[in-house]
């Protein structure tokens, strides 16, 4: 377990560096195509550093805002707070900030950069449809993400992919409507080839970023399932919760493909999609979560 935590920390810094390099290369390609020269290169470096820094410090706030999460204040959330407090004592974690998303679909996610700066959000549908034992299993799963430092890795990836997609879109729009600047020194056959490569990179970069995000491994969810069960010492609780998630037909209205990876199960899949395990290898490779049936079976074998 401790080895996995250390591996996640190393993977986090590696992925941060890779996203930084990709953003930098993207802005340099943008600069080359528009011919801004040395000033543009300096701006590219500044933008890349700012985006990497912003991903690290503000990604949790962005994820919560995009999901329209609000603080879980009020007596109606007392059970929610009590369960998290008990699990945090058992796990040796500080209590994270608790949020709720007004949505009838049962789901939950954790975000933040470390256990001291973490947050957990659940939908109102989860609070209504899960009994105490099932809710405890889901919350233990989310707290395991915090303890294993999965939250930083996932949240940074979500924010960085969004930034890369935005940069690529802006670059292509400038190319389409404005073209290259006049007087650019990049001329001739070599310049044309480099321009072609830069243009292709603007198109391919968002796809590369998505592949990097999915490379953060679906095993992260399996590890959180097992870690959560070790925390509650009651596998049937999480098993029953996952079965309810599998059978529920609702999708989270405030979720998006950018934040899909954060949730305990894909918030955009219908019941039919959750049950479909016969997709092509390419479809399976781009899934953000392991099949719920597989996760349930692993827990039943414990």
Predicted feature residues:
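Select transmembrane alpha-helical segments in multipass membrane proteins
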Residues: 199-204
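Short, hydrophobic transmembrane alpha-helix segments
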Residues: 25-39
